[in-house]
């Protein structure tokens, strides 16, 4: 492996900013001679210049958490201060890239070193300086114009899906003294020069932002548009909004990763940031393998999904401390695209691994442990992460709205939801998609348990549904009632058997089975069912509930007459209708199209009505 090509830190005041290693304990290093350093300042530890961050200061002693393997660091090694907090580079080139937890570009490092491992102390800029981007300045901006933080002063077509808007960093303002003409520039070329109070400042297309700091916005707005996931059980029963927070807790093998990957593939978001935090490396390689092949249709053109996705990979065999950084890196990238006016979804898979990293570092610092050994500030850290979600009015001109939705997978040990991470998360998030091991063992996927899951956004979304799908809200209420009734009846059935139930109860059981097997269950690996558009979800639910209502009415109306209609008579006479109801999910939205599917469902509804009429006559 040739390390000579990798750049080292070069700093004029290098000697003035040097402390010395005093002790090493795993990823935690103590350094002396650090007077004047700041909390969360970035430092370089040892002769290999390992990346670290100051997490505690006492006198001239600093405690540093190192984001790389510390073997070989010895007492007396230099600790170089950079004077900057841990920051990320924000600019063209993020989409389609894969970074590690501290935004080092993995593909660039592998090209440089010809190795599958990241060498220690590597210092490669996150965004390539060699690529030229086609920059177009804003039409209404000229020399002498006034410009303030968040204003868009140019556009770069990053790819055919993402128009990358070049914004002025939030804290800058001034009068334009130079703006670059349209043309090809790389990320180190100056494209804008401002003067403010006699001081001139130059700007490139890249801005640097500290990861622990929230990017400012004009105001936070209430969320009112659903995040459509393409999973029927989530869209119909437990919807999330664009700008919402969601937790997916579940034991191993329940399908958390499949749900978060299908969200990344099919949800109605403009940008996806997928953070693999302490999960298996195979899952990230699966994403890298699947996403470039997956396509979506935009304005009649077929595009690769990878063009709207950025990956932050911090697998379980990478240093523990960097897991914490990867979550912050991911959310900062999300906020940057939100500020352009995009709807961003961030998948964090999984926040439990992040909490475990906090626990390990906290243990090394000899802090007082709380529940299960986690630090006392676990809840505060989780809250400060989830609170960065939301729908906002972005800073600067032109006026625009953006949102960040956070979907956090949680892996409680043994599937125990009373685990501190799960209970702290549930106190913060608004949507809970609880995965059930028993459903997963019965091969019922997505294994979302409809009895324990909930969404607090249903009220906020009622207005949207009333406007676009008027019949949907009562349908959802009815479906939940049927599923709840079925759960109550299940105990009676086990005691006395199905035969001794009332006719209406038999119908409830039958329709609940229909809803569970042919509506809530969904095969994510088939072309017809991997993504279910909302019109198809509503159409299917509408016919199933209509079937329930008609059956119930038929049984109740003829209960006193001589020719009683019972559950078994309906089942014998309507086997074809039942078969068509169970086959509704096989309609392919891509091949058949919306008009044909809606017409087929309407036809089925008509045939159902006619069948019940003739049965009653």
Curated annotation (Swiss-Prot):
Record's catalysed reaction(s): ATP + H2O + 4 H(+)(in) = ADP + phosphate + 5 H(+)(out)
Pfam families (alphabetical): ATP-synt_ab, ATP-synt_ab_N, ATP-synt_ab_Xtn, ATP-synt_VA_C
Matches recorded under SUPFAM superfamilies: C-terminal domain of alpha and beta subunits of F1 ATP synthase, N-terminal domain of alpha and beta subunits of F1 ATP synthase, P-loop containing nucleoside triphosphate hydrolases
GO cellular component: cytoplasm; vacuolar proton-transporting V-type ATPase, V1 domain
Location, primary (coarse class): cytoplasm
Family note: Belongs to the ATPase alpha/beta chains family.
Encoding gene per record: ATP6V1A
Enzyme class of the recorded protein, top EC level: translocase
Residues binding ATP, per UniProt: 250-257
InterPro entries per record: ATP-synt_VA_C, ATP-synth_a_Xtn, ATP_synth_asu-like_sf, ATPase_a/bsu_AS, ATPase_F1/V1/A1_a/bsu_N, ATPase_F1/V1/A1_a/bsu_N_sf, ATPase_F1/V1/A1_a/bsu_nucl-bd, ATPase_F1/V1_b/a_C
Regulation: ATP hydrolysis occurs at the interface between the nucleotide-binding domains of subunits A and B. ATP hydrolysis triggers a conformational change in the subunits D and F, which induces a shift of subunit d. The c-ring is subsequently rotated and results in a continuous proton translocation across the membrane.
Keyword Ion transport: yes
Membrane among keywords: no
Organism in which the protein naturally occurs: Gallus gallus (Chicken)
Keywords: ATP-binding, Cytoplasm, Hydrogen ion transport, Ion transport, Nucleotide-binding, Translocase, Transport
Subunit structure of this chain's protein: V-ATPase is a heteromultimeric enzyme made up of two complexes: the ATP-hydrolytic V1 complex and the proton translocation V0 complex. The V1 complex consists of three catalytic AB heterodimers that form a heterohexamer, three peripheral stalks each consisting of EG heterodimers, one central rotor including subunits D and F, and the regulatory subunits C and H. The proton translocation complex V0 consists of the proton transport subunit a, a ring of proteolipid subunits c9c'', rotary subunit d, subunits e and f, and two accessory subunits.
Lineage: superkingdom: Eukaryota
EC code: 7.1.2.2
Tissue specificity comment: Ubiquitously expressed (both isoforms).
Cellular location(s): Cytoplasm
One example GO MF annotation: proton-transporting ATPase activity, rotational mechanism
Annotated function: Catalytic subunit of the V1 complex of vacuolar(H+)-ATPase (V-ATPase), a multisubunit enzyme composed of a peripheral complex (V1) that hydrolyzes ATP and a membrane integral complex (V0) that translocates protons. V-ATPase is responsible for acidifying and maintaining the pH of intracellular compartments and in some cell types, is targeted to the plasma membrane, where it is responsible for acidifying the extracellular environment.
GO biological process, alphabetically ordered: ATP metabolic process; cellular response to increased oxygen levels; intracellular iron ion homeostasis; proton transmembrane transport
Protein's UniProt name: V-type proton ATPase catalytic subunit A
